[in-house]
């Protein structure tokens, strides 16, 4: 940099005749930092990445090939302040050594360096010329005589032709590759392939498709001649949930996607449809109207009941135990009454439809079966449990939330033995107020002490049982239910035989 005299070369050194700047590319590094000011000062451009038309500069020995140009090209052009021939500096594999320009060859080449030519053809030509000169003049030229310029010109011209041929061949190969790349286009899915994919998914895996096993099976069985990735992408992007195709009917109609034609034929809403495929799609308007009225009445009856039950659940949190128990009982009675009303209305709708349409007895019989099936399957969800709850079911475990335990206390209040439930509630409320604990904490303490109120109160006061034995834990309860003699012996040693017997009876109650 210092030898260059502070960048004294021309500002248009690396500018073409038409005024466009020459483009160069050098990999990032110290060499790029060194050449960047030289190129930009001469009017050239330094590309950040490889671009078509840019000269790829490389240090001698680092890269080889006709597409690379030695960095000595930039240094020589800046030193002479003249744009030299690029082909003389291309790295064509001669161990990374650049070719020198014609001017440097004229200055440094001597007669004794003719034998050291890199090409064998040039050596043979020069030897033939030297032999011809000897035969004519019978003497050798002195070392101080000038070199024949015609021979040097012929050698340089042959090298230029070879380099141009190499570059042209490389360009042809690159153009052919790019043409092949542009010619290859993705095959579009046909309608037949889409239908085959949808049929296979419907018949083999109607509820499965998130994994890769289904799509790999389709690729192995060659349902369509595509990769499993392409099949999966096609299904989830363009086929799933869209009604572009009408698939043929099969036996498994539950997994079939509904088409536009099928939507025009309304059918009764049932959880398990047992209507055969031979049922006609056309119905009389009277039957359809009755069915619609029946379904609307069902939803109107069930809607308020569910809203009231939700409101009751939210209000139960801030009410006392007795009021919550009464509200739960009233809500269950209201739900059962609403259920009975809906059942009666359904029966009336079915009987009315059967009277009006006696000619279509077979079709109406099918609708009656479907409606009754709908009632039988839905009514058990709203039934009030009639069995009584014991203390074990009153508290399910140590991790039970307080809201669930409060609901179970309300259900205990509706058991047949009202005196015992009232006494239990009073004892729970008294311990809650005395020790300032929640209902969940008190019931858990009661469960750990086999349901004994005195032992539970002593445990809440002192933190231990009156007899000095430890408190029962859930792991020991699970071990106690196993028929293992060693485990039973260990529990007897830990809790005592009397406590183990009481615990077995308590868990069995």
Curated annotation (Swiss-Prot):
Residue numbers of motif Nuclear localization signal?
Answer: 493-509
**A Gene Ontology biological process annotation?**
regulation of double-strand break repair via homologous recombination
Q: Where in the cell is it found?
A: Nucleus; Chromosome, Telomere
Q: InterPro entries this protein is in?
A: BRCT_dom, Homeodomain-like_sf, Rap1_C, Rap1_C_sf, TE2IP/Rap1, TERF2IP_Myb
Annotated region Disordered: the residues are 93-168, 249-359, 399-423
Q: Where is the composition biased (Polar residues)?
A: 115-127, 401-418
The cellular component terms of Gene Ontology attached to this UniProt record, alphabetical and capped at eight, are: chromosome, telomeric region; cytoplasm; nucleus
Q: Which UniProt keywords are given for this protein, alphabetically ordered?
A: Activator, Chromosome, Nucleus, Telomere, Transcription, Transcription regulation
Ranges of Basic and acidic residues compositional bias? 159-168, 286-296, 321-344
Residue ranges constituting the Myb-like domain according to the UniProt record? 185-239
Q: What is its main location?
A: nucleus
Per the UniProt entry, the signal peptide is none
Q: Where is the BRCT domain?
A: 1-91
User: Which family is this sequence assigned to?
Assistant: Belongs to the RAP1 family.
Report quaternary structure and partners. Answer: Homodimer. Component of the shelterin complex (telosome). Interacts with terf2; the interaction is direct.
What is known about what this protein does?
A: Acts both as a regulator of telomere function and as a transcription regulator. Involved in the regulation of telomere length and protection as a component of the shelterin complex (telosome). Does not bind DNA directly: recruited to telomeric double-stranded 5'-TTAGGG-3' repeats via its interaction with terf2. Independently of its function in telomeres, also acts as a transcription regulator: recruited to extratelomeric 5'-TTAGGG-3' sites via its association with terf2 or other factors, and regulates gene expression.
Q: What is this protein called?
A: Telomeric repeat-binding factor 2-interacting protein 1
Gene designation: terf2ip
């Amino acid at each position: 940099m210092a030898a260059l005299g502070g960048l004294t070369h021309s500002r248009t050194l690396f500018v073409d005749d038409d005024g466009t700047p020459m483009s160069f590319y050098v990999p990032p590094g110290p060499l790029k930092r060194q050449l960047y000011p030289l190129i930009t000062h001469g009017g050239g451009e330094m590309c950040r990445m490889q671009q078509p038309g840019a000269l790829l500069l490389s240090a001698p020995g680092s890269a080889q090939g006709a597409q690379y140009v030695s960095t000595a090209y930039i240094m020589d052009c800046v030193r002479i302040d003249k744009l030299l021939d690029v082909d003389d500096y291309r790295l064509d594999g001669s161990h990374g050594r650049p070719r020198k320009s014609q001017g440097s060859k004229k200055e440094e080449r001597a007669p004794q360096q003719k034998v050291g030519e890199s090409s064998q053809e040039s050596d043979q030509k020069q030897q033939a010329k030297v032999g011809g000169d000897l035969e004519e003049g019978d003497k050798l030229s002195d070392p101080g005589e000038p070199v024949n310029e015609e021979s040097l010109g012929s050698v340089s011209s042959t090298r230029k032709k070879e380099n141009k041929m190499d570059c042209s061949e490389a360009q042809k190969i690159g153009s052919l590759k790019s043409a092949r790349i542009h010619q290859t286009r993705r095959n579009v899915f046909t309608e037949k392939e889409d239908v085959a994919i949808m049929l296979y998914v419907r018949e083999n895996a109607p509820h499965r498709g998130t994994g890769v096993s289904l799509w790999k099976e389709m690729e192995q069985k060659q349902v369509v001649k595509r990769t499993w990735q392409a099949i999966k992408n096609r299904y989830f992007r363009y086929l799933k949930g869209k009604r572009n195709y009408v698939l043929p009917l099969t036996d498994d109609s539950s997994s079939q996607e509904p088409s536009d034609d099928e939507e025009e034929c309304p059918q009764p809403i049932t959880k398990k449809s047992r209507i055969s495929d031979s049922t006609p799609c056309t119905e009389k308007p009277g039957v359809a109207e009755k069915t619609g009225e029946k379904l609307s009445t069902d939803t109107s009856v069930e809607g308020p009941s569910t809203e009231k039950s939700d409101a009751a659940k939210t209000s139960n949190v801030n009410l006392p135990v007795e009021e919550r128990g009464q509200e739960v009982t009233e809500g269950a009675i209201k739900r059962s009454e609403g259920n009975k009303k809906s059942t009666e209305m359904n029966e009336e709708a079915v009987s009315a439809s059967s009277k009006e349409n006696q000619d279509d007895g077979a079709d109406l019989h099918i609708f009656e079966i479907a409606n009754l099936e709908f009632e039988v399957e839905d009514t058990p969800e709203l039934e009030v449990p009639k069995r009584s709850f014991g203390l074990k079911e009153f508290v399910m475990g140590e991790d039970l939330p307080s809201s669930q335990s409060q609901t179970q206390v309300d259900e205990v209040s509706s058991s047949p033995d009202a005196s015992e439930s009232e006494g239990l509630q009073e004892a729970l409320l008294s311990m809650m107020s005395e020790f300032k604990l929640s209902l969940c904490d008190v019931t858990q303490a009661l469960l750990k002490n086999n349901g004994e109120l005195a032992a539970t109160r002593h445990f809440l006061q002192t933190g231990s049982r009156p007899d000095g034995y430890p408190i029962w834990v859930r792991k020991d309860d699970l071990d106690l239910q196993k028929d293992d003699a060693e485990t039973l012996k260990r529990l007897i040693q830990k809790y005592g035989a009397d406590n183990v017997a009481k615990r077995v009876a308590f868990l069995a109650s």
